[in-house]
């Protein structure tokens, strides 16, 4: 199990990214717009740099909702492969069965 501080840090990053998402999108639209003047685009770049570093969604790491494990996490379930296996064998995930051919 991952340390609780790491799990909480990821939650904080996700919350911060969600908070600044509209502002980041607006600034990036200005930066990408070729119709805008160079100075406007430059100022938008500077403003984007002033945003908190953890507001960038690429700094987020997918973690298991139960254990906090950072690797082997399935996006569809939000769980690590180990926990998916345990829960699937118990029959707690509807429609998920072990493959056999």
Curated annotation (Swiss-Prot):
Entry-linked Pfam families: Ribosomal_S14
Enumerate the UniProt keywords alphabetically: Ribonucleoprotein, Ribosomal protein, RNA-binding, rRNA-binding
Q: For this chain's UniProt record, which GO biological process terms are given? A: translation
One term under GO cellular component: cytoplasm
The record's HAMAP family line, in alphabetical order, gives: Ribosomal_uS14_1
Function, please? Binds 16S rRNA, required for the assembly of 30S particles and may also be responsible for determining the conformation of the 16S rRNA at the A site.
What is the annotated quaternary arrangement, including any partners? Answer: Part of the 30S ribosomal subunit. Contacts proteins S3 and S10.
Q: Which NCBIfam families match?
A: PRK08881.1
Record's protein name: Small ribosomal subunit protein uS14
């Amino acid at each position: 199990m991952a340390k609780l501080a790491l799990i909480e840090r990821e939650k904080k990053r996700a919350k911060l990214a969600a908070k600044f998402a509209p502002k980041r999108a607006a600034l990036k639209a200005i930066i990408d717009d070729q119709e805008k003047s160079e100075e406007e685009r430059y100022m938008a770049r500077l403003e984007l740099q002033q945003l908190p570093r953890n507001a960038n969604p690429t700094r987020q790491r997918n973690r298991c909702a139960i254990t906090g494990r950072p690797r082997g996490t399935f996006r569809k379930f939000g769980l690590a492969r180990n926990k998916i296996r345990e829960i699937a064998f118990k029959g707690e995930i509807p429609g998920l069965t072990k493959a056999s051919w």
